[in-house]
Amino acid sequence: MSLVGGFPHHPVVHHDGYPFAAAAAAAASRCHEENPYFHGWLISHPEMSPPDYSMAPSYSPEYANGAAGLDHSHYGGVPGSGAGGLMQRPVKRRGTANRKERRRTISINSAFAELRECIPNVPADTKLSKIKTLRLATSYIAYLMDLLAKDDQNGETEAFKAEIKKTDVKEEKRKKELNELLKSTVCSNDKKTKGRTGWPQHVWALELKQ
């Protein structure tokens, strides 16, 4: 039966008088021998069709190489365990920078330790910070310069008193007053004094009041 109108399907009559009909029949027979499935599909019922090959995934080298890794990561496995997932993250090497920083820190700490040993009369149980060490060293240098200015050979390091108290906002004002007192003391004491010499007692009294 034909699909159009339900009329019976008339068979095709081949006429030997037409040369192209014989050529077409020969080509159809060769096609049937080479690909019988395709020929059978052409003459079979319209509802029967070959599988749709357009829906099948095309071959891709990237998909083939990374398929194993993708499957593992999709089902909770370890990502990157397939053939294409063997890449490792580059590790930054900072060993050289760390060694340089460590050597620099050790050098600075050793220099401050040597400077603390040069400051006299510092209690043994006192821990001096770096800024406090620099301030005490500056004060001690000023004291030694004052001794040289007075040309006093009897000055001793025991006369220097290391100040351990915390500095306040009025530190600049206190330094100015201390310098004025030192200048007045130098002017009044023209003659050399015998015995131990050092900072005047009233200067230390002023220091203790701060």
UniProtKB/Swiss-Prot annotation:
**What is a single Pfam family found in this protein's UniProt entry?**
HLH
Q: Where in the cell is it found?
A: Nucleus
Question: What PROSITE patterns does the annotation carry?
Answer: BHLH
Ranges of Basic residues composition bias in the record: 90-101
Q: Which GO terms describe its cellular component?
A: nucleus
Cited InterPro entries: bHLH_dom, E-box_TF_Regulators, HLH_DNA-bd_sf
Q: Using the UniProt annotation, give all residue ranges assigned to the region (Disordered).
A: 81-101
Tissues of expression: Heart, liver and spleen.
Keyword annotations for this protein, in alphabetical order, are: Developmental protein, DNA-binding, Nucleus, Transcription, Transcription regulation
Q: Which GO terms describe its biological process?
A: heart development; regulation of transcription by RNA polymerase II
Can you give the residue ranges of the bHLH domain? 92-144
Q: What molecular functions are annotated in GO for this chain?
A: DNA-binding transcription factor activity, RNA polymerase II-specific; protein dimerization activity; RNA polymerase II transcription regulatory region sequence-specific DNA binding
Q: How does it assemble?
A: Efficient DNA binding requires dimerization with another bHLH protein.
Protein task: Essential for cardiac morphogenesis and for the development of branchial arches. Binds DNA on E-box consensus sequence 5'-CANNTG-3'.
Q: What is this protein called?
A: Heart- and neural crest derivatives-expressed protein 2
Q: Lineage of the source organism?
A: Eukaryota, Metazoa, Chordata, Craniata, Vertebrata
**Gene, per the UniProt record:** hand2
